[in-house]
């Protein structure tokens, strides 16, 4: 779809990865309240928060990311037009490059180790002969947000969840698992709506379900392994020095949390991976600081999520490598615009949230 739109608008293909990153890896992933992205779900068990943590700050961050990204893409497009550059100027691949991406073992390895997905899944499942109307296509997305909100604000709080404190249920609480429950149920309901509205358009629904189930194995096992890795790191004697250094960073706990998450996201090349390790190792410490200082856990949740979506988009990131391969572009052609849109814009939004959160608290 992106290639068709860019070709029709005579927009350079090299800007396509940045445009995709703006829509998938910035405000929709880390800032918009209620987003079902895994990055927004990871902090919930640590801070006892919901997907709608710090909604006001999240909306402000989303506006900053989107406005800055759209501004830069507009500048880049205008500059390309003045130079006489159009869609066909990037011509080393002229067709749909997804088969090449799915067959490239290097691309598959980088994407897989980044806890994203196996690009070979692009070619699995079945495709409908024609797409649904725009209203039917958007409805499942609306169901996710609405169901998530209803579950979080009304259904789960009204339930008797005293049984969760029993050892057989892990001696947990609703605040620790409620966010995960609401996201899971919202996604399940959206899938049911999608299937019900598009059943006749699905030539082989079982093949699509099988492909989706297979694709889910990699992120599930990867996140589980990261939790174990984070626990091992936290148990090392040298970790105390790292923890003291992180907590000693000037600017308060919000800055410390942001720096720790940024560094680990950069090292792992993954937003979810970096945040999982950071919170598994330092989450209890930051939660204790929150209780002692009165700092809102919702604010820490939003700062952690936005921080994870900044330096994760370095050149070795599996999603970046896969996106460039699928779009038929190279790092030399497209990476600068992608960094400005996905990294610099997120950094500006992160600083904005930290400043506003420090001044006014969570809202």
Residue map of PLM features:
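Short amphipathic alpha-helical coupling elements at transmembrane boundaries
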Residues: 3-8, 48, 89, 207-215, ...
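Core transmembrane alpha-helical segments of multi-pass membrane transporters/permeases
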Residues: 174-238, 263, 267
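Alpha-helical transmembrane segments of multi-pass membrane proteins
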Residues: 11-28, 54-59, 63, 253-266, ...
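Juxtamembrane boundary at the C-terminal end of a transmembrane helix
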Residues: 353-363
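Interfacial loop-to-transmembrane junctions
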Residues: 10, 212-213, 323-344
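Re-entrant/interfacial helical elements at transmembrane boundaries that shape
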Residues: 1-5, 34-46, 273-288, 318-327
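Long, contiguous bundles of hydrophobic transmembrane helices that form the permeation core
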Residues: 56-204, 322, 326-327, 340, ...
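Hydrophobic alpha-helical transmembrane segments of multi-pass integral membrane proteins
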Residues: 1-3, 220-233, 247-288, 305
């Amino acid at each position: 779809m992106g290639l068709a739109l860019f070709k029709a608008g005579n927009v350079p293909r090299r800007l396509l990865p940045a445009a995709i990153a703006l829509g998938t890896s910035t405000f929709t992933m880390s800032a918009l309240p209620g987003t079902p992205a895994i990055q927004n779900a990871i902090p919930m068990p640590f801070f006892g928060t919901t997907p709608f943590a710090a909604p006001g700050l999240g909306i402000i961050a989303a506006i900053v990311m989107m406005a800055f990204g759209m501004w830069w893409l507009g500048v880049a497009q205008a500059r390309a037009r003045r130079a006489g550059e159009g869609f066909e100027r990037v011509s080393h691949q002229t067709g749909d490059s997804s088969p090449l991406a799915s067959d490239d073992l290097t691309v598959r390895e980088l994407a897989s180790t980044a806890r994203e997905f196996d690009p070979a899944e692009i070619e699995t499942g079945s495709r409908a002969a024609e797409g649904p109307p725009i209203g039917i296509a958007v409805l499942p997305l609306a169901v996710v947000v609405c169901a998530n909100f209803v579950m979080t604000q009304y259904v789960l709080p009204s339930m008797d969840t005293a049984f969760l404190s029993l050892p057989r249920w892990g001696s947990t609480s609703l605040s620790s698992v409620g966010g995960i429950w609401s996201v899971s149920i919202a996604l399940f309901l959206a899938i049911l709506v999608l299937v019900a509205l598009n059943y006749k358009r699905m030539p082989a629904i079982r093949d699509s379900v099988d492909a989706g189930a297979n694709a889910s194995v990699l992120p599930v096992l990867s996140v589980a392994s990261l939790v174990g890795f984070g626990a091992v790191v936290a148990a090392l004697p040298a970790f105390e020095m790292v923890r003291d250094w992180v907590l000693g960073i000037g600017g308060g706990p919000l800055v410390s949390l942001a720096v720790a998450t940024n560094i680990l996201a950069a090292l792992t090349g993954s937003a979810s991976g970096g945040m999982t390790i950071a919170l598994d190792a330092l989450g209890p410490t930051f939660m204790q600081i929150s209780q002692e200082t009165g700092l809102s856990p919702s604010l820490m949740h939003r700062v952690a999520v936005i921080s994870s979506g900044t330096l994760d988009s370095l050149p070795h990131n599996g999603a970046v490598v896969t996106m460039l391969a699928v779009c038929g572009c190279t790092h030399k052609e497209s990476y600068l615009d992608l960094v400005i849109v996905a990294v610099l814009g997120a950094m500006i939004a992160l600083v904005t949230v930290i400043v506003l959160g420090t001044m006014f608290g969570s809202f």
